[in-house]
């Protein structure tokens, strides 16, 4: 009996030793809190550096000198055999306030697409105009259809006396002092056509001298 008890005690001791060794191995394999913190900080630091490197190669955002303004936005429909087709029509004016101005009209199924097309059309129809001390050289009347727009020069400090579609053209063109008045129909597209017609019809003293075959001093 004594030998059997001794053997049993020895077996229990071996099992206890094996369990302790197994627990120690698991404890060694388990990552420590310091190791986890180092790994996380290293990962975050590496990602931050990569982001900085990516920012170096990113191209700076291009900012256009032209300003866009939506003058008219409306929904239109076309009746066909299959039903009504709904679209959007947009009238846009673009200018750099330094003597370049243009306008465009476009249609599309969605508003963003119509705006993009109208802006592109406006950039393709840019005009270079003359500005004399923030105003125009002389009084002029622009015409388009049933619309007539009167443009008159104004002294400095007067400001822009205009409204609606006429004001969009005058402001984005770069004028600061001018009188305007609508003498006909107030359809936005016709008012813009008439305003541009009047602006482009003005003659500077140099152009008048060239047309009359005279010097500036003789005028």
From Swiss-Prot:
The entry's keywords: Ribonucleoprotein, Ribosomal protein, RNA-binding, rRNA-binding
Coiled-coil regions listed: none
Biased composition (Basic and acidic residues): 35-47
Sequence ranges of Polar residues compositional bias: 1-21
Molecular function as annotated in GO: rRNA binding; structural constituent of ribosome
Function: With S4 and S12 plays an important role in translational accuracy. Located at the back of the 30S subunit body where it stabilizes the conformation of the head with respect to the body.
Protein's UniProt name: Small ribosomal subunit protein uS5
Gene this chain is encoded by: rpsE
């Amino acid at each position: 009996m004594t030998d059997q008890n001794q053997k049993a005690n020895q077996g229990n001791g071996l099992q206890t030793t094996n369990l302790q060794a197994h627990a120690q191995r698991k404890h060694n394999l388990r990552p420590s809190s310091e190791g986890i913190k180092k790994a996380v900080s290293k990962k975050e630091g590496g990602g931050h550096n990569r982001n900085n490197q990516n920012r170096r190669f990113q191209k700076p955002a291009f900012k256009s000198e032209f300003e866009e303004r939506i003058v008219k936005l409306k929904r239109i429909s076309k009746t066909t055999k299959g039903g009504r087709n709904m679209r959007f029509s947009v009238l846009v004016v673009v200018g750099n306030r330094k003597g370049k101005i243009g306008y465009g009209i476009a249609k599309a199924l969605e508003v963003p697409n119509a705006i993009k097309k109208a802006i592109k059309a406006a950039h393709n129809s840019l005009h270079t105009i003359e500005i004399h001390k923030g105003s125009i050289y002389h009084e002029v009347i622009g015409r388009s259809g049933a619309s007539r727009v009167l443009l008159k020069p104004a002294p400095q400090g007067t400001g822009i006396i205009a409204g609606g579609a006429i004001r969009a053209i005058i402001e984005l063109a770069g004028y600061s002092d001018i009188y305007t008045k609508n003498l006909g129909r107030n359809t936005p597209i016709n008012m813009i056509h008439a305003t541009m017609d009047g602006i482009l019809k003005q003659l500077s003293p140099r152009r008048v001298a060239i047309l009359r075959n005279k010097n500036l001093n003789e005028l």
